[in-house]
Amino acid sequence: MGRFIFMSFGLLVVFLSLSGTGADCPSDWSSYEGHCYRVFQQEMTWEAAEQFCAQQRKESHLVSFHSSEEVDFLVSITYPILKADLVWIGLRDIWNECRLEWTDGTKVDYKEWSEEPECIVSKTTDNQWISRPCSRTYSFVCKFQA
């Protein structure tokens, strides 16, 4: 009996010490490299998701990625929760930034882009980025600095 109590106490100490590793993040957020992340299952447009993130915490936005390790972390927390393929990330309007050229070398002097802006989703299985109309609805991940 004394051994059981000792083991239980030891496990409690380990649990409490590990729970402090993400102490700068709220309990329902995950911690990685000084940032807090939370997966939201509800589906929203890109703009609504970004506004929702901003309402959750000061300086919170749709997730941004800055290393392959961060992506691996995001995949590890996103896919098990959503079991979905695509989530909004904090990129949009990439076509306005691209340098376009025709394969024959002529100048791009005529453009017929859709009126609707494009935003970016990430595949939760392998982090491939895909542009989608911002008006579509997807789940999303919010991020803020701890």
From Swiss-Prot:
A Pfam family this chain is assigned to: Lectin_C
Signal peptide: 1-23
First-listed, main subcellular location of the protein, grouped into a coarse class: secreted
Disulphides: 25-36, 53-142, 119-134
UniProt GO MF annotations: toxin activity
Keywords: Disulfide bond, Hemostasis impairing toxin, Secreted, Signal, Toxin
Tissue expression summary: Expressed by the venom gland.
Entry GO terms, CC: extracellular region
The C-type lectin domain, residue ranges: 32-143
SUPFAM superfamilies associated with the record: C-type lectin-like (SSF56436)
InterPro entries in the cross-refs: C-type_lectin-like, C-type_lectin-like/link_sf, C-type_lectin/snaclec_domain, C-type_lectin_CS, CTDL_fold
Location(s) in or outside the cell: Secreted
Note: Shows greater sequence similarity to the beta than alpha subunits compared to other heterodimer snaclecs.
Family under the similarity heading: Belongs to the snaclec family.
Free-text function comment from the UniProt entry: Interferes with one step of hemostasis (modulation of platelet aggregation, or coagulation cascade, for example).
Assembly notes: Heterodimer; disulfide-linked.
Name this polypeptide is given: Snaclec 1
Organism: Sistrurus catenatus edwardsii
Phylogenetic classification of the source organism: Eukaryota, Metazoa, Chordata, Craniata, Vertebrata
